[in-house]
């Protein structure tokens, strides 16, 4: 009995600890406002981390491109075995044989070389242009990161506002369902008393079912919005989001906006065009000469055996300075075709930039107009929503008192649902425009 009690106690303790561990393992992220959600996403979005790594890569490539201005220095050592010494034809007078030629061999079988070689590019137009391209690509990577951050802010704001508006819609739906259930109960009671027919009961039940369908649809929309937020905020599915901000049912003081901040996507197109122009210049520099210089300083040792001595008297100095110029004469039609391709790419980049500037200007103007219209529209539909809500409550009281029929009440309730839908849609549209404005300011 004593052993059983101890075992039972340990079992209970294990269950309590497991429960506590499960609670701790569920992480909760509280969102006080849309700014909180945006800041969290900017710190934890996995795709943004890739853009930052691309920035580091471009910066590293730019540093590498500047190395052409520095000399390349290398040390070398070699051992040469002359299996057959070279033969030189000399006049016989040297050997006391006038009028004849003598084949003579000079040198020793083993030669040892050790020295340092320094090579420096004096003038290389291709390397200079590649450095400029790397510099532009570094700036381009930074601008691409900024453009992605702008899009990320817009997505976070859009899903955030969709979530809190849908939560508000669910609260309204639940209130509507409560009223619909009350109508169904009241109609069923009247049916039992013979005051209404089965058709009225069916109408009341259909009305309640329709509202339940709206609730389920909004639950799906809320789950989708939360799921998208979790993804772009870098959260796991087990980590919960808590929205501490709610959409106010009363009208907010919305302000018109006359201008938008600069679209960072345009900067990306501008630098893509710059990069294409530099690439065209790079292809043209392939025709230009290259000037290089090489300096070698070393020592040699000649021997008839394989041994090697390290005293200073055993070595002789050997140094040289080498200047070279490399001029492309004929490379087939490769360079010509590369230049033509680069010209086409540059024209494409220029056209894309011009088109994007025109489209952005038009879209920005349309966005500001739509935002202004949506604010005006939201004010009107909110007033209609509040008025039809009052009419719905009055009609319910009149139906309870038998002053109006169920059909008359349903007509009022239908007007209320239409006004509710219009208000929620207007709220959603206004916040969707505001999400874009927020990302640009």
Language model feature labels by segment:
Residues 1-34, 424, 430-431, 435-441:
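Bacterial Sec-dependent N-terminal signal peptides
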Residues 22-74, 78, 84, 236-237, ...:
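Bacterial Sec-pathway N-terminal export signals of envelope proteins
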Residues 24, 32, 36, 60, ...:
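Periplasmic alpha-helical coiled-coil/stalk elements that build and connect Gram-negative outer-membrane
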Residues 24-29, 76-116, 120, 295-327:
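Small/polar, glycine/serine/threonine/aspartate-rich low-complexity segments that form flexible
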Residues 37, 44, 51, 120, ...:
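Amphipathic alpha-helical coiled-coil segments and their boundaries
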Residues 49-53, 66-67, 122-149, 199, ...:
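Sec/SRP-type N-terminal targeting helices
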Residues 51, 73-77, 116, 269, ...:
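Membrane-embedded beta-strand positions of outer-membrane beta-barrel proteins
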Residues 210-235, 386-441:
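Short segments within alpha-helical structural elements
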